[in-house]
Amino acid sequence: MSWQAYVDDHLMCDIEGHEGHRLTAAAIIGHDGSVWAQSATFPQFKPEEMNGIMTDFNEPGHLAPTGLHLGGTKYMVIQGEAGAVIRGKKGSGGITIKKTGQALVCGIYEEPVTPGQCNMVVERLGDYLLEQGL
């Protein structure tokens, strides 16, 4: 399966039990900031934004004072899982980023998708990739 198929079929799909509800944007990005696959709607990000995200995985709490920035959008960092998941909130939407051995699985959402639904979609694929050694 191609990386694009993972994004299209496992991230940008309808949320279980909620036909028509799906993430706004999603991507799989290497730890070096290279995009493996992304939805057409995923924002263009700057290398320093990705560096900040990777630093927060290695030093949990790094982004808390400044917020998480991606594609010029600032998200308030909310409770995640140190070294494994970063979650951010902006208005009625937000972002979930799950770190695997080689990649970051990113999902961005807006209402009516809930934070919990975004977490479930992103973390399920991230956990699967971890199980596959990726």
Curated annotation (Swiss-Prot):
Phosphothreonine PTM positions: 114
Cited Gene3D superfamilies: Dynein light chain 2a, cytoplasmic
UniProt motif (Involved in PIP2 interaction) ranges: 84-100
Transmembrane domains' residue ranges: none
Primary location group: cytoplasm
GO molecular function: actin monomer binding
Swiss-Prot/TrEMBL keywords: Actin-binding, Allergen, Cytoplasm, Cytoskeleton, Disulfide bond, Phosphoprotein
Assembly and interaction partners: Occurs in many kinds of cells as a complex with monomeric actin in a 1:1 ratio.
Family stated for the protein in its record: Belongs to the profilin family.
Protein name (database record): Profilin-2
Source species of the chain: Olea europaea
Lineage: Eukaryota, Viridiplantae, Streptophyta, Embryophyta, Tracheophyta
